[in-house]
Amino acid sequence: MDIVFMGTPDFAANILQKLIEEPQFNIKLVVTQPDKPVGRKQILTPPPVKEFALKFNLNVVQPDRLKGNEEFFEVLKKINPEVIVVVAYGKILPKEILQIPKYGCINVHASLLPEYRGAAPIQRVLMDGKNYTGITIMKMDEGLDTGDILLQEGIEIEQNDDVITLSKKLSELGAKLLIETLKNISNIVPVKQDATKATYAPPIDKKEGQISWDMSAVQIYNRFRALKIWPGIFTIYKGKLLKIHEMEIAKLDNLENVQNGTILGINETGILVKVKDGVIKLKELQLEGGRKMSARDFVNGYKIKKGDILS
């Protein structure tokens, strides 16, 4: 089966690898986003899918745009793929592309559609504190994740899962379901989504990383594990941005009349902070302009003590 693969992040690269390992699939072209400046030094960096594809000597293209890109349309028509596989590519496909392959464009989406349609289903399901999610293999149409369902399977979200671990699990499941779908593509009966049950997973805004001590411990923890890759969670301390790199929920009693944000205790493993309904333990921190520190080094470096208020 001749395939064009469209994808960008590690999640997609893992699935591409599984496709390459299947001898009946011939990856004719890999389409990914353009290289982008990354980090403080703004170093031009290729997306993970490009790096992976080049290791296997696959043909790679990186169009700046899809809509109205006649040159790119002609490239696809010349290849004449039986299917275009789309995994976290990052752009909506125009009708001209959807109509090219014999079996259409097949998307691997990291949620149980119609729930969590959109760009950030893994982050949003973690932020919402859900304990179940999954993968949907969908035949794409012109809408945002509105196409017919070809295959679907759910998995449990563990309490200690974060965006990194859950992405890996879903990527593995996505590869398995995609391969199963492609092998049986001519026999699968598509199922329409129930639009009345649709929920949405819009892109993450950097501002969503800011937490407040007036939030509950679970809210803060869910945001921490959802936004661990980007933008991370942070608060403001003495007018500077304070990033929280590692944390956990803790327990202490007799917290009535204690102001949220108060440091309740300091030990070898972390700083205990009062929040809306309990306590969190800060284990690794970084103040704006400084380096990442263990809680112990942070306490020593900034002369923090029990009873101080982090604000």
From Swiss-Prot:
Keywords: Protein biosynthesis, Transferase. (6S)-5,6,7,8-tetrahydrofolate binds at S111, L112, L113, P114. PROSITE patterns: GART. SUPFAM superfamilies: FMT C-terminal domain-like, Formyltransferase. GO terms for cellular component: cytosol. GO terms for molecular function: methionyl-tRNA formyltransferase activity. Its EC number is 2.1.2.9. It catalyses: L-methionyl-tRNA(fMet) + (6R)-10-formyltetrahydrofolate = N-formyl-L-methionyl-tRNA(fMet) + (6S)-5,6,7,8-tetrahydrofolate + H(+). Pfam families: Formyl_trans_C (PF02911), Formyl_trans_N (PF00551). The keyword Ubl conjugation does not apply. Attaches a formyl group to the free amino group of methionyl-tRNA(fMet). The formyl group appears to play a dual role in the initiator identity of N-formylmethionyl-tRNA by promoting its recognition by IF2 and preventing the misappropriation of this tRNA by the elongation apparatus. This is Methionyl-tRNA formyltransferase.
